[in-house]
Amino acid sequence: MSIKPEEISSLIKQQIENFQSDVQVQDVGTVIRVGDGIALAHGLESVMAGELLEFSNGVMGMAQNLEENNVGIIILGPYSEIREGDEVKRTGRIMEVPVGEELLGRVVNPLGQPIDGRGPIETSKTRPIESPAPGVMDRKSVHEPLQTGIKSIDSMIPVGRGQRELIIGDRQTGKTSIAIDTIINQKDQDMICIYVAIGQKESTVAGVVETLRQHGALDYTIVVSASASEPAPLLFLAPYAGVSMGEEFMYNGKHVLVVYDDLTKQAAAYRELSLLLRRPPGREAYPGDVFYLHSRLLERAAKLSDAKGGGSITALPFIETQAGDVSAYIPTNVISITDGQIFLQSDLFYSGVRPAVNAGLSVSRVGGSAQIKAMKKVSGTLRLDLAAYRELEAFAQFGSDLDKATQAKLNRGQRTVEVLKQGLHEPLPVEKQVAIIYALINGFLDDIPVGDVRRFESELFTFLDHNKKELLDHIRTTGNLPDDSEFKAAITEFKQGFVTTK
């Protein structure tokens, strides 16, 4: 059998044409140092900043320091199995988290993986955790109220949708309680809530989840938890993961509330990572870009223009102070980024004024334009009255013979403080807040003993609910006060039947 040369050449041509290469080219590096949640790798010449990298045991990392001879990687998971000399390869992707309505009612870690034992989350949508904030022309000024259900906040330090309002105070002053009450109060308000727990005890997070479940608030809430036992990289990423989940809803025209509890622990985790990556330390050993750490996060909260769908993200970041020192580095940074702050004072908390809001140091820079007219009308002088009372209270301790005007101011002040007290997880609808503050400023409480004020309040609400529901409905639907004489007549009618304790 003779083999013809032209047949051989055509066979070879055919083989070459049909040849399929299964070789995949991958950029691979080698781990040269690992420890404390940080790895240093050689190679990876063309890696991107923030790119996801995969170690040989399947654990993911994120490229942070891009240096001439090596790459600093933060490890997003357990690092005890990673050894010097291990391979680390590029994925070509940047850090993303799953997003969508499937996450509602779930507890996830900062990578979007469920940690509540209720099975996988069926969503195919993802968003990068770092994304640019909406530009100037994409925004609209804050004009819709976000009712927290807390009298002292909704009356004196109002929050609007799209605002960033800092909640600042020492540990154990009721910061988390304010956030939980605000989330509970969003029921039936078409609002999606995201609670980001950073460096909290797992028992605390479990308690928060259970409280939300009991009040039916978990159905519209996503809990993102990076507990104290997690590595620093996850604590650093948790807030960005939370806001990315919120952006998916915002850009679809929905309203979102994101609570960051708390950013002090995120800053500490970022300081830890930066020092391990050998970045130069600055004031209080924080790296030079710690301001940018928080500003790029909080700038993503916005009220979008109508052309962009009119959605919003409202941010409630928490900062924990040491002995009430608001002039430390991180507190001053975040105060300068946000649109106001609610300052909680431990002295007030321990003296039984809860929520322990210090009205003098608290401010809302843009919330006033979002307040309903009825609340604006009744609460106009509340802050000044309270400040005057605090001043007189200190003065009155030194002398007993006070003139009638001073005594009247002290009496009104005591009742104001009493009215602004509120039980835990008892948020009030805005129409009831308006009713009790209206009664207060019009002198209906001046002759009620201080000890009876809380009872007067609850019985007034019951009376209005059963006998004068149209007054409350009018405030809720129109945002305006009802007819003055009608409102006063209703409160007078109730007061005549109110029995004070002897």
UniProtKB/Swiss-Prot annotation:
InterPro entries xref list: ATP_synth_asu-like_sf, ATP_synth_asu_C, ATP_synth_asu_C_sf, ATP_synth_F1_a_nt-bd_dom, ATP_synth_F1_asu, ATPase_a/bsu_AS, ATPase_F1/V1/A1_a/bsu_N, ATPase_F1/V1/A1_a/bsu_N_sf
Domain of life: Bacteria
Keyword annotations of the record: ATP synthesis, ATP-binding, Cell membrane, CF(1), Hydrogen ion transport, Ion transport, Membrane, Nucleotide-binding, Translocase, Transport
Location(s) in or outside the cell: Cell membrane
EC number: 7.1.2.2
Cellular component, GO annotation: plasma membrane; proton-transporting ATP synthase complex
Region Disordered, annotated ranges: 114-139
Record's function text: Produces ATP from ADP in the presence of a proton gradient across the membrane. The alpha chain is a regulatory subunit.
Name under which the protein is recorded: ATP synthase subunit alpha
Organism listed in the record: Halalkalibacterium halodurans (strain ATCC BAA-125 / DSM 18197 / FERM 7344 / JCM 9153 / C-125)
